[in-house]
């Protein structure tokens, strides 16, 4: 079992990274929450990792925080929930907010995650409510939807997110699309560039 990787960030795509550890490059699939907070290429980085073993493939998933890793692993224990849905959860919300949604049986909030319908949301609540532990501090009420993963810093990113929301996309969809275009957008993109690139991602589904 590969528990974590610590090394140099070699390259990164929309939902994956390659980390060089002692001359060996490890390719990890990552959620938007991790992708949007990665350092620059060439910098040192550490990811908590989950290795999925199948007959035809070995797939490594990486997360910046232990909380993200723990939630990913917990989600995979739910019948019918695979890595794709688990990554979608972490790409559109933070672990504490998702745990609150489960604790308060907020099905509407859970269903806002791409790939999760009503039946899956009900199954998540049924199977996870007794496993998530105490509701995190500050979770005194039912959340008004799930807060999205932190977007890259900069006013242009925030303005682009609001522009996408104004076009009818959810806050989670906007955050996930913007996270996927970070590498392509460059260091100081304009709002127009960010919106255009994000819309391409959203149109692709």
UniProtKB/Swiss-Prot annotation:
Residues 153-205 are annotated as: Domain III. Residues 144-153 are annotated as: Flexible linker. Residues 65-143 are annotated as: Domain II. GO terms for cellular component: cytoplasm; Holliday junction helicase complex; Holliday junction resolvase complex. GO terms for molecular function: ATP binding; four-way junction DNA binding; four-way junction helicase activity. It is found in: Cytoplasm. Belongs to the RuvA family. This is Holliday junction branch migration complex subunit RuvA.
């Amino acid at each position: 079992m590969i528990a974590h990787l610590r090394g140099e960030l070699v390259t990164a795509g929309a939902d994956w990274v390659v980390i060089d550890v002692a001359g060996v490059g490890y390719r990890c699939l990552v959620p938007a929450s991790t992708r949007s907070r990665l350092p620059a290429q060439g910098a040192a980085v550490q990811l908590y990792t989950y290795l999925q073993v199948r007959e035809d493939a070995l797939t490594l998933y990486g997360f910046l925080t232990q909380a993200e890793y723990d939630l990913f692993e917990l989600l995979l224990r739910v019948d019918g929930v695979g890595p794709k849905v688990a990554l979608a959860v972490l790409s559109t919300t933070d672990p504490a907010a998702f745990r609150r949604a489960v604790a308060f049986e907020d099905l509407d909030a859970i269903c806002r995650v791409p790939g999760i319908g009503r039946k899956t949301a009900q199954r998540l609540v049924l199977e996870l409510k007794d496993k998530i532990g105490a509701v995190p501090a500050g979770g005194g009420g039912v959340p008004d939807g799930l807060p999205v993963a932190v977007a890259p810093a900069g006013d242009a990113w925030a303005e682009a997110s609001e522009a996408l929301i104004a076009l009818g996309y959810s806050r989670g969809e906007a955050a996930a699309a913007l996270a996927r275009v970070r590498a392509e957008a460059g260091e100081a993109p304009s709002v127009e560039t960010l919106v255009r690139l994000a819309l391409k991602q959203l149109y692709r589904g």
